Design a protein with these regions (language model features):
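Terminal accessory/targeting
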Residues: 1-79, 90-236
Length: 236
């Protein structure tokens, strides 16, 4: 996140770990704009929709500025996605695709959860309904990316598991993955003081996700299913 409070530290760590696959998490909700005049960004999805409708936000200029900031820090992103999946909105998607093409970033996230993300149950009815509704946008989404020469994965998983990501759910998901390339969205981390004070609901769950990703059961499930772990750089 180019407008994130810990950007400088994250960029330093990325430079120290050149094998790390780093993407750009484009932000149009929350925080301050990177592009002049560095105004406050909308605080919610409804506020962003109103800003888009009123043409009060220069989407392309802001997203391009965020990518330029990352490039200036010595990092070339391998992929793009957006905070809160805002590129599901047509004007944002167009801007993201333009930015990807301009800066030679080949991959863009396709955030349409595969139904089996809810393997074993547990996803809220709202998340299941939202995920199902979003899939109706998939055709147009893929056409826009193709028109700009962008690539995306065959499948995506993780939306319905957000906040309830545990070893059991991950093992079930791995065993039910379809053929092709699947991006797994996750939010692993350590619950330190900064995270406790952060404005996010994903706090304790980050340690649960980290535990699931490192679990022996997860490794065994990957082996049993014949799943190969890759990153975007390996797919370029």
């Amino acid at each position: 996140m180019a407008n994130g409070e810990a950007f400088d530290d994250a960029a330093r760590l990325a430079r120290q770990t050149p094998s790390l696959d780093v993407g750009c998490h484009l932000v149009l909700i929350g925080g301050w704009a990177v592009a002049p005049p560095h105004a406050r960004l909308p605080e919610s999805a409804p506020a962003l929709v109103r800003a888009l409708a009123g043409r009060r936000i220069a989407v392309y200029e802001e997203l391009a500025a965020q990518v330029r900031k990352i490039l200036a820090a010595g990092i070339h992103p391998t992929h793009l996605d957006t905070h809160k999946h805002t590129h599901l909105a047509p004007p944002v998607l167009e801007a993201v695709a333009r930015v990807a093409a301009e800066f030679d970033i080949r991959w863009v996230r396709k955030p349409f959860d595969i139904p089996l993300t809810a393997a074993g149950g547990g996803a809220t009815a709202l998340k299941r309904a939202t995920s199902g509704s979003l899939r109706l946008l998939r055709g147009r989404f893929e056409r826009v990316l193709a028109r700009h020469g962008c690539r995306t994965t065959d499948h995506f998983a993780g939306f319905q598991m957000t906040g309830r990501f545990r070893t059991r759910e991950l093992v079930r998901l791995i065993g039910a993955l379809p053929d092709g390339i699947t991006e797994l969205m996750c939010h692993p981390g350590y619950l330190g003081g900064d995270l406790r004070r952060a404005h996010t609901r994903l706090k304790e769950s980050r340690e649960h996700e980290l535990e699931a990703l490192l679990a022996a059961e997860t490794r065994a499930a990957l082996t049993a299913a014949g799943v190969e772990l890759v990153n975007y750089r390996m797919l370029a």
